[in-house]
Design a protein with these regions (language model features):
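HKD-type phospholipase D/PLD-like phosphodiesterase module
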Residues: 1-5, 13-35, 119-154
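Conserved small/polar residues in nucleotide/adenosyl-binding loops
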Residues: 2-11, 243-248
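Signature of lipid phosphatidyltransferase scaffolds
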Residues: 5, 10-72, 76, 160-166, ...
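Proline/glycine-anchored alpha-helix kink/cap motifs
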Residues: 9, 78-85, 106-117, 146, ...
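Active-site lining segments that contact anionic ligands and/or coordinate catalytic metals
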Residues: 25, 87-89, 115, 133-136, ...
Length: 250
């Protein structure tokens, strides 16, 4: 409660609260009291209860409604930036990349000069190292924990946009299911996710490139400082918690 008024907080996660999978899955979650997101979630549950058939979402991106149009807009923005000779970057972390339409969007972005990094744990139907995908790299991490988070980064002219949610880029997720994605609005949380993606892209112990034959090629280079992303990010989060605790004590 906030000054005798009810304060509603919602949780949006890339996974669920399961006592078994929580021990082995690596997920990301957001607790928020942002009124716009809270209201969007309320609308979403009304959709699930069949009380609303044509919902209007202000912040939340929901499959079968506004998710795909917004993804195309975000990719299109990066394409326009690249064509204008400005920095254009996309980083997409997910479990699976299979939808032909969205793969074509990424090919178009690559051809326009957008630098794209994909972190895909499972099935990936995009083929790198081709003339139409020369600006796309695919990383796969297989380590102690199952990589389960879906986090999407768009450079957006130096004002990064971060999104997090449940859908992979598969036809079943984008066209048939109800899946939700939230923007990350808090700048500190944005930076944490950006740092997570950066650490994962530096992994040279448990990560591999996916080549044009869709085979895994280990990144290991004896001349580079070893980085094991899952453990490095764990230490990173511990340092964030210690910093927060020290700041609270001052």
């Amino acid at each position: 409660r906030r000054q005798r008024q009810m304060c509603i907080r919602d949780s949006i996660s890339t996974g669920n609260f399961n006592e078994k999978t929580a021990r082995i899955y690596a997920d990301s979650g957001l607790f928020t009291s942002n009124e716009i997101i809270v209201n969007d979630l309320y609308t979403l549950f009304r959709v699930l209860q069949k009380e609303v058939t044509e919902p209007k979402f202000k912040r939340l991106l929901v499959a079968r409604f506004n998710l795909l149009p917004e993804l195309r807009r975000r990719i299109g923005y990066e394409i326009n930036m690249a064509k204008a000779g400005k920095e254009a970057r996309i980083i997409l972390k997910m479990n699976a990349l299979q939808d032909p339409a969205m793969i074509d969007e990424l090919y178009k972005a690559s051809e326009a000069g957008v630098k794209i990094d994909l972190i895909v744990r499972g099935i990936c139907c995009l083929i790198p190292n081709q003339p139409y995908s020369r600006n796309i790299r695919i990383t796969r991490i297989v380590d102690s924990f199952l990589e389960h988070a879906r986090v999407w980064y768009f450079h957006h002219g130096g004002k990064p946009l971060l999104f997090m949610g449940s859908p992979d880029w598969m036809r079943r997720n984008l066209y048939r299911r109800i899946e939700a994605v939230t923007p990350i609005l808090d700048e500190d949380l944005k930076q944490q996710l950006i740092d997570m993606l950066a650490i994962q892209l530096k992994d040279n112990r448990k990560a591999g490139w996916v080549d044009e034959n869709l085979n895994n090629v280990l990144k290991r280079n004896p001349e580079e400082e070893p980085v094991r992303a899952q453990y490095a990010f764990y230490e990173y989060l511990k340092s964030c918690l210690l910093y927060t605790s020290d700041a609270a004590d001052e």
